[in-house]
Amino acid sequence: IIDKFPKEYEFIIAIGYKGDSVREYCELAFPTHKFTFVEIDNVDGYASGPGYSALQCKSYLQRPFYIATCDCLIDSPMPHLDGNWLGIHPTSYPEKYSTVQLSGNDIIRYSNKNENGYDMAFIGLAGIWDYGVFWEQLEDNIVEGEIVSAFKTPSNYPTFKAKKLKWLDTGNLDDLNKTKEYLNDKPLSLQKDNSEITYKEGNTFIKFTPNKSVLDNRIIRAKELGGKIPDNFKYTNNFIS
């Protein structure tokens, strides 16, 4: 999803569980991008959730901004930040998703995981133009840490549009496998039975190695090989590149 945005954009990333791995990967894969990582103090306790995490990032987002949840991919161009909008995709299972009712391209009603909801699902991608309204709505209506609490009453925003996008969900194992099949496993991510994963970003290969002793031995070997390996070899606590 990072590749969908201009390189000069700033990315505010909330991190918690496995946050070090997220930070290390982003910095290896996108060394020229500007990232700000916000460590969330409550990732699994009472009232934790995407909305709570977003509020921890509030001070960095006092201007129009995009929201992208970590399990959302799209096979569409990134819409412009030209107003308040939600990315949507048709669904037959309103009980599984936050859904919206439309009048043309205007969002007029919202429902959260209700079998009596609507046929357009919020995909986890949004443009927030009236950020003051967003923060006010989130703080006033947040339930169980949900970020979608900010969209409970669409009429509280000056305008709220829908953007229909080709959504690739990765929020559960079945959808993740479908997405990998759809993308032909691109960008390359070769996962082994030992939980190692190799990623490819541009011309850079990045290997995630959860076994610390294996990783340390590879780093030692790379140093001993010296000039026999590429001179841009890098390593972190979880990766080699």
Regions found by a protein language model. Give the residues of each.
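ATP-binding glycine-rich loop module of kinase domains
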Residues: 191-221, 230, 238
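A cross-family kinase active-site recognition segment
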Residues: 241
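Conserved beta-loop-beta/alpha segment of the NTase-like Rossmann-fold superfamily
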Residues: 27-104
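Conserved core of the sugar-phosphate nucleotidyltransferase
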Residues: 74-147
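Short, aromatic/basic amphipathic alpha-helical patches
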Residues: 24-29, 218
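Short beta-strand
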Residues: 160-162, 231-236
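Conserved alpha/beta core of the MobA/IspD/sugar-nucleotide pyrophosphorylase nucleotidyltransferase superfamily
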Residues: 119-195, 200
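N-terminal glycine-rich phosphate-binding loop and ensuing alpha1 helix
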Residues: 1-22
